[in-house]
Amino acid sequence: MAKGLRCKHRIRMRNIKRQHYAKKDLERLKKIVSKSSELKDVVTMKTTEPIQENKTSEGTSTDGSMEVDKMAKVINKKTLQDENGHYPEWMNQRAVKKQKQKLNKLKIKKKSGKVSKAIKW
């Protein structure tokens, strides 16, 4: 397909804009380089060797036991709620709403003590 006049005009305008911003960008980069060369004398860089040695010495333990901070959540299989009454993170709001309706039906059925008269297949 051929390119339209509007498309060609937009391409030309983008090229002009690119050239215009290239000048500003070049000046900005030159300023950054000059500042970084001035700061190079002030800043002292650390080598990675001592840092890595510290990590390896801290990471290894002699007894070989691990400390576990997080306790496993206890979830009720029937209600799918944890001990605080919250649903799991992976469960979306629609599923939570559906689960609550299901639990309410069970509560009503349990309170009335009657079995529904609907035909069960």
UniProtKB/Swiss-Prot annotation:
Compartments reported by the entry: Cytoplasm; Secreted
UniProt-listed GO biological process terms: dendrite extension; learning or memory; long-term memory
Induction pattern: Up-regulated in the somata of the procerebral neurons after associative conditioning with paired presentation of a carrot juice odor and an aversive quinidine taste.
Location of region: Disordered: 44-67, 95-121
Pfam (any one): LLPH
Start-end of Polar residues biased regions: 45-64
Cysteines paired by S-S bonds: none
Keyword Secreted: yes
Tissue specificity statement from the Swiss-Prot or TrEMBL entry: Expressed predominantly in cerebral ganglia (at protein level). The mRNA is highly expressed in cerebral ganglia, and is detected at lower levels in visceral-pedal ganglia, head, and body, but is not detected in the tail.
Keyword annotations from UniProtKB, A to Z: Cytoplasm, Secreted
Broad class of the protein's primary localization: cytoplasm
Single GO molecular function: basal RNA polymerase II transcription machinery binding
GO CC annotations on file: cytoplasm; extracellular region; nucleolus
Record function comment: May be involved in modulating long-term memory formation and retention, at least with respect to odor-taste associative learning.
Family membership noted in the UniProt record: Belongs to the learning-associated protein family.
Protein's name according to its UniProt entry: 18 kDa learning-associated protein of slug
Organism this protein belongs to: Lehmannia marginata
